[in-house]
Curated annotation (Swiss-Prot):
Keywords: Aminoacyl-tRNA synthetase, ATP-binding, Ligase, Mitochondrion, Nucleotide-binding, Protein biosynthesis, Transit peptide. ATP binds at residue 335. This is Methionine--tRNA ligase, mitochondrial. It is an enzyme of class 6 (ligase). The lineage of its organism: Eukaryota, Metazoa, Chordata, Craniata, Vertebrata. Residues 1-10 form a transit peptide. SUPFAM superfamilies: Anticodon-binding domain of a subclass of class I aminoacyl-tRNA synthetases (SSF47323), Nucleotidylyl transferase (SSF52374).
């Protein structure tokens, strides 16, 4: 009976019920009118921020900033996950009470995200009263819907992952001391057998609804969607969603039974509802949502979270954007190997935008990526210092552009022999916003940045071949050609900086300031690029450039990057 109820609930959530078409349409319109919610995972406070946390936040930030630049109202939520056994143990090891420990580490996350210019609109802490209220209300809803019951859980539990595991998700392993232990197949962390009376969630009844949800292809990139389908090929066991307070004291109490605390992952996942204003219905409790997450927590987001939402009568997430991990110099990062990359140190070495650009340009969500200081230095010097910075310097230098303005453009000024090159460049520039849009929406930010870099290099080649420094200002035809070359290069730079803004907002702002672009025109919505090349009125012709503040991105010397 619960299975059929779950399927009916899921159909109604998506507006598929034939007997309530108008109501469903109104509901869909109401949901669609709400701001789109982008989220990072909330990060566990048992340890300091690392490169993986930063990468999740950057990918979410790009999606959020790009939506805003396109005129779409959106929010970005991040935060810290502060309950559970690992936190309790970490605080105890330092002789601190859990709340003090959580506040200290949570501040570290907020500080590094501020340093990286993450444009979050909400920072949720799971120890906040508003979140505790949301979790308690959500639990009661699941209970009222008949999805929670009391039973005995017997099986494997991984404290490091805060995860209950089936026999098939574990394997026997020999540790460094030669002892036989059992570990999680996914994480490699040790598991222990537990047998305790807990509250259980009827996950088994929701498998058909989850399979229906997967038909909408919500998980990206495709290999991760395939993995979730693989997990759902077998029956799902019911899930333990509480721990006895005698075993774990640091958590949110079960509303109707204070001898139990709510399972840390149920607690943590509800943060997305907390950020949306749940349980206050006047705060648009749950609208369109996109979750950014690492592949190590995919199961929790692609099975448990949509199941919880469907059971509570709420729509599952629209998109799960999943990324892989970072290694260091070809090796998994480990404190014992002393190869952990410190984000704060990277900001000092490469600047905020340098680190942002390297991670977004070098990282690819569908595969693990390797961080090396050598590749970071080479990439940043090549693409930011030389290509983009060099192009800006060339067309704004007083020797080339003595009037320090956007000159006039006329296609006819170009010699017939070079018009094919001009035509090709214009075609590439006109196509670039379309390509960038497609790649960002496909969660392939590195591909979007690759397209921009290719166009920047094409512009440099165009500028070099036209050699405006050889053209004499005193000769009318040469002066007109010089002006057209400079205009086209400046307009190209305006386009590049606008498209780069979601990835490197600080650097893009420097370029747009130098070009004298008003803030209202730093958007993709109702913005016209290259108007003069189409014979249209161009706002920027004869506009004065902004002040010169020096090199856009000074080259990194070897000593600075190692």
């Amino acid at each position: 009976m619960l299975r059929s109820l779950a399927l009916r609930t899921f159909a109604n959530i998506l507006g598929l019920s034939s007997r309530s078409g108008s109501t469903a349409a109104m509901s869909r319109n109401a949901v669609a009118s709400r701001p789109h919610l982008y989220t990072t995972p909330i990060f566990y406070v048992n340890a300091a921020p690392h490169l993986g946390h930063v990468y999740s936040a950057l990918l979410a930030d790009v999606q959020h900033r790009y939506s805003a630049m396109c005129g779409i109202e959106s929010k970005l939520s991040t935060g810290t996950d502060e309950h559970g056994m690992k936190v309790q143990q970490a605080a105890s090891a330092l002789g601190l009470d859990p709340q003090t420990f959580c506040s200290t580490v949570s501040l570290q996350f907020r500080t590094i995200f501020d340093a990286l210019d993450i444009s979050y609109t909400d920072f949720v802490r799971t120890t906040e009263p508003r979140h505790i209220e949301a979790v308690s209300r959500f639990w009661m809803t699941l209970e009222e819907q008949g999805y929670i019951y009391k039973g005995t859980y017997e099986g494997w539990y991984c404290t490091s992952d805060e995860a209950f595991l089936s026999e098939g998700q574990t394997a026997e392993h020999t540790d460094f001391e030669g002892n036989k232990i059992r570990v999680s197949l996914e994480s490699g962390h040790q598991v222990h057998w537990v047998s305790e009376e807990n509250y259980m969630f009827r996950l088994s009844s929701l498998r058909p609804a989850l399979l229906n949800w997967l038909q909408t292809e919500p998980v990206h990139p495709a290999p991760f969607l395939k993995l979730v389908h693989h997990w759902l090929e077998e029956e799902l066991p019911d899930l333990s969603v509480s721990r006895q307070r005698s075993r774990l004291s640091w958590g949110i109490p079960v509303p109707s039974d204070s001898s139990h605390v709510i399972y840390v992952w149920l607690d943590a996942l509800v943060n997305y509802l907390t950020a949306a204003g749940y349980p206050n219905p006047q705060l648009a409790p749950w609208g369109p949502s996109t979750h950014l997450l690492g592949k190590d927590i995919l199961r929790f987001h692609a099975i448990y979270w949509p199941a919880f939402l469907i059971a509570a009568g709420l729509p599952p997430p629209q998109k799960l954007l999943v990324h892989s991990h970072w290694t260091s110099e070809g090796t998994k990062m480990s404190k014992s190997l002393k190869n952990v990359v410190d984000p704060s140190d990277c900001i000092r070495r490469y600047t905020t935008d340098g680190l942002r650009y390297y991670l977004l340009r070098h990282g690819a969500p569908e595969r693990d990526c390797d961080f090396t200081h050598r590749t970071a230095r080479m990439l940043l010097n090549s693409e930011l210092a030389d290509a983009l910075g060099g192009l800006l310097n060339r067309c704004t230098a007083p020797a080339i552009n003595p009037m320090q303005h956007f000159p006039k453009f006329q296609y006819e000024n170009f010699p017939v022999a070079s018009r094919d090159q001009v035509h090709d460049l214009l075609g590439a520039l006109q196509e670039l916003p379309v390509e960038v849009d497609q790649w960002i929406k496909k969660f392939q930010v590195h591909k979007a940045l690759e397209c921009i870099d290719a166009c920047v290099r094409r512009s440099n080649a165009f500028f070099q071949s036209q050699a405006p420094w050889k053209l004499q200002r005193g000769v009318e035809k040469e002066a007109a050609l010089r002006d057209s070359v400079i205009y086209l290069t400046l307009e190209a730079l305006r386009l590049y900086a606008t498209l780069l803004h979601p990835a490197v907002p600080g650097l893009a702002t420097v370029v747009l300031d130098r070009l004298g672009v008003p803030h209202k025109m730093r958007t993709l919505k109702k913005n016209t690029f290259l108007a003069a090349t189409r014979g249209e009125i161009c706002y920027f012709q004869a506009q004065t450039l902004g002040p010169d503040k020096g090199l856009l991105f000074p080259r990194l010397e070897k000593s600075e990057a190692f």
